């Protein structure tokens, strides 16, 4: 008896495009769970010290 076929990609592309291949929805705040703690700590400091130039203009005078 002949061996049976194990795999084929036939019709898979058509099935995927039937409802359209969509990009994942972008959220305003992406979850940080499981991310590198060193990177997250640096992000926190960067966010804390991210000051626009116009906000502290009156302090120097």
UniProtKB/Swiss-Prot annotation:
UniProt signal peptide: none
GO MF entries: structural constituent of ribosome
Pfam families for this protein: Ribosomal_L29e
Composition skew (Basic residues), residue ranges: 15-31
Entry keyword Glycoprotein: no
GO cellular component term of the entry, any: ribosome
Metal-binding as UniProt keyword: no
Chain intervals for the UniProt region annotation (Disordered): 1-61
Family: Belongs to the eukaryotic ribosomal protein eL29 family.
UniProt protein name: Large ribosomal subunit protein eL29y
Organism: Arabidopsis thaliana (Mouse-ear cress)
């Amino acid at each position: 008896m002949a061996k049976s076929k194990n795999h084929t990609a036939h019709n898979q592309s058509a099935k995927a495009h039937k409802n359209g291949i969509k990009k994942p929805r972008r959220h305003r705040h992406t979850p940080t769970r499981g991310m590198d703690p060193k990177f997250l700590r640096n992000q926190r400091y960067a966010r804390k010290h991210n000051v626009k130039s116009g906000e502290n203009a009156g302090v120097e005078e």
